């Protein structure tokens, strides 16, 4: 399930560290978090959609690795992002 371009652009502008920033860990993690929440809602209605469940697990793993990278490189940015996204940590 792809994100709508308008929603993705809104997330990018909200979490970007500078103009045109699409690759910073904050932006990537925010986009992944939105995709994860959308897929989670989809799976609540379609419990037997195992292909989507596998894709969701891959996205969760990718977000976990990005969060680990951010925690290793800049703990302050990591804590701010966790707080902002409302992720448990």
Curated annotation (Swiss-Prot):
Cellular component GO terms, alphabetical? cytosolic small ribosomal subunit
Q: Does the keyword Transcription apply?
A: no
State if S-adenosyl-L-methionine is listed as a keyword. no
The UniProt keywords, alphabetically, are: Ribonucleoprotein, Ribosomal protein, RNA-binding, rRNA-binding
InterPro entries registered for this protein in UniProt: Ribosomal_uS15, Ribosomal_uS15_bac-type, uS15_NS1_RNA-bd_sf
State the SUPFAM superfamilies in the record: S15/NS1 RNA-binding domain (SSF47060)
GO MF, one term, reads: rRNA binding
Top-level taxon of the source organism: Bacteria
Q: Name one Pfam family in it.
A: Ribosomal_S15
Biological processes per GO annotation: translation
Briefly state the protein's biological role.
One of the primary rRNA binding proteins, it binds directly to 16S rRNA where it helps nucleate assembly of the platform of the 30S subunit by binding and bridging several RNA helices of the 16S rRNA.
Q: What protein family does this chain belong to? A: Belongs to the universal ribosomal protein uS15 family.
Subunit structure, briefly? Part of the 30S ribosomal subunit. Forms a bridge to the 50S subunit in the 70S ribosome, contacting the 23S rRNA.
Q: Which HAMAP family match?
A: Ribosomal_uS15_B (MF_01343_B)
Instruction: State the protein's name.
Output: Small ribosomal subunit protein uS15
* Record organism: Kocuria rhizophila (strain ATCC 9341 / DSM 348 / NBRC 103217 / DC2201)
């Amino acid at each position: 399930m792809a994100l709508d371009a308008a929603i993705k652009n809104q997330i990018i502008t909200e979490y970007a560290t500078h103009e045109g920033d699409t690759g910073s860990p904050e932006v990537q993690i925010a986009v992944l978090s939105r995709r994860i929440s959308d897929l989670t809602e989809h799976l609540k209605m379609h419990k037997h959609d195992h292909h989507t469940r596998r894709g969701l697990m891959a996205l969760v793993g990718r977000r976990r690795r990005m969060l680990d990278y951010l925690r290793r490189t800049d703990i302050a940015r990591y804590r701010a992002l966790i707080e902002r996204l409302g992720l448990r940590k």
